Amino acid sequence: MDPQVAFFIAQGISVITGIMAIVMMQLKSMRVILIFQILTNLFASSSYLFLDGKSGMLVSLLAVVCSVVMYFYNTKNRKPHLLVAALFIAAYVASAVYSTVTSNDPWELLPAFAATCFVLSLIQTKASYFRIFATLNPVFWLPYDLHTASYVMFIVHFGILVSSVIGMIRLDGLFRKKK
């Protein structure tokens, strides 16, 4: 495929991802948040695929699997075992190391750090705790997005960061004075 066409397709997919991700940070139900996580990560993996961001694509696909697993735990009103979280984190690190070695690009490690924050956000049972860890996730994605020329995903991740903070203020009472 022509690189310019792939670039524009990726940016278009990223716009859809961004809208969904920003809305997701304002949701109260962890179950609905997990459904949005599945969808946004499917779109994000497609975007990174078109931009040849191997690690970003792998991490996003693993995030889909992780979100599905966490969704089933949530539907049973059970907290996931820490072993499940540790396995996903190990898979993220392995995918990042693989991508880094095959591409000889240390930037490919950043998605693994973002994914660790992602897993820590998903093992939370309350949406307020989810938002705390979800706020850290874009901090690692932002430089990776610039490196892979995923400019719309950069805007998406910046929007997620801002929306997370707004959600923490609006829904979780961040900065409210205690009476």
Q: Which ranges hold each PLM region?
A:
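Alpha-helical membrane-protein topology signature
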Residues: 1-179
